[in-house]
């Protein structure tokens, strides 16, 4: 029987994809492109919505990562460290809005989270056998390409940011499925 700690990541993925896509769709301005965090920081109601999504989904992913994936995978310490970078970055991004005096700190924690996401995907590639490892390599390379695009094409940042986040979610789901 599969333990209950297997399922929260699937719920988190559904919520995250739905809620973050909705936020981007409703608030994105083609004339003034922004990151998800910058869009959320424009209004208090959007910031609250963004915080709830990050905290809830991050915590649901944490349940699956710490209590299902980490105990079953090769290199559990490295996986736990990479996940912790992602999780702490995620929680911190929700606290520090992407505006004004806090913008530089927000950017630092966003980069910490991105490093955690990308590291996790590559570690899954190394730690998972067969087809699952191959899928993780595809996710890792696609995420790397998106990071390069985010760094070089700031005008379309949000269009690279969302797939990067969703590929990270997919990477976690593949790892959970491989370890069930």
Annotated model-derived regions:
Residues 11-22, 62-65, 120, 135-150:
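Hydrophobic core of alpha-helical transmembrane segments in multi-pass integral membrane proteins
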Residues 23-31, 88-103, 142-159, 177:
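C-terminal ends of transmembrane alpha-helices
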Residues 42-45, 108-122, 164-178:
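Small-residue-rich segments of transmembrane alpha-helices in multi-pass membrane proteins
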Residues 83-132:
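Membrane-proximal helix-loop-helix units in multi-pass membrane proteins
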Residues 125-180:
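Terminal transmembrane helical module of multi-pass membrane proteins
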């Amino acid at each position: 029987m599969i333990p209950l700690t297997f399922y929260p990541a699937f719920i988190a993925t559904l919520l995250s994809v739905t809620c973050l896509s909705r936020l981007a769709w409703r608030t994105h301005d083609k004339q003034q492109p922004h990151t998800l965090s910058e869009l959320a920081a424009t209004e208090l109601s959007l910031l609250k919505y963004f915080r709830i999504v990050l905290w809830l989904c991050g915590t649901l992913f944490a349940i699956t990562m710490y209590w299902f994936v980490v105990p079953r995978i090769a290199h559990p310490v490295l996986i736990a460290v990479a996940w912790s970078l992602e999780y702490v970055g995620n929680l911190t991004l929700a606290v520090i809005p992407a505006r004004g005096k806090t913008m530089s700190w927000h950017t630092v924690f966003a980069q910490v989270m991105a490093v955690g996401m990308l590291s996790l995907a590559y570690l899954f590639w190394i730690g998972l056998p067969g087809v699952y490892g191959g899928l993780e390599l595809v996710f890792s390379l696609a995420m790397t390409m998106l990071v390069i695009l985010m760094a070089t094409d700031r005008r379309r940042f949000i269009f690279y940011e969302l797939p990067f986040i969703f590929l990270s979610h997919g990477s976690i789901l593949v790892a959970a499925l491989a370890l069930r």
